């Protein structure tokens, strides 16, 4: 579960290393975001000379969470870290590579470009 003030690792090659969640999109009272949900965040750590810099406000989709998530077949999925991929307004990823596994829930949310770039879908 990602909420305001949560810090997430960035799992792409945009140059950002870490973002801070400042809003969970999807309604005025929405508090938590899970795998496949879109958040608005600010870049807290970035590589020098990258496409994004510290302080930029960006949209991102959550691809890994440490909080377990129950799937329709009764199994649970959980990861070792909270991670997100930066996206454009249209939903396409800003980077050209994705690092680490991503959740299968992204397929249900129609993030096919992220699914195709990911090395592993769990």
UniProtKB/Swiss-Prot annotation:
GO cellular component: cytosolic large ribosomal subunit
InterPro entries: Ribosomal_uL14 (IPR000218), Ribosomal_uL14_bac-type (IPR005745), Ribosomal_uL14_CS (IPR019972), Ribosomal_uL14_sf (IPR036853)
Gene Ontology BP term (one): translation
An example Gene Ontology molecular-function term: large ribosomal subunit rRNA binding
Alphabetized CDD domains for the sequence: Ribosomal_uL14 (cd00337)
Keyword check for Metal-binding: no
Keyword Transmembrane: no
Keywords of the record: Ribonucleoprotein, Ribosomal protein, RNA-binding, rRNA-binding
Known role: Binds to 23S rRNA. Forms part of two intersubunit bridges in the 70S ribosome.
Complexes and interactors: Part of the 50S ribosomal subunit. Forms a cluster with proteins L3 and L19. In the 70S ribosome, L14 and L19 interact and together make contacts with the 16S rRNA in bridges B5 and B8.
NCBIfam families: rplN_bact
Family: Belongs to the universal ribosomal protein uL14 family.
Protein's name according to its UniProt entry: Large ribosomal subunit protein uL14
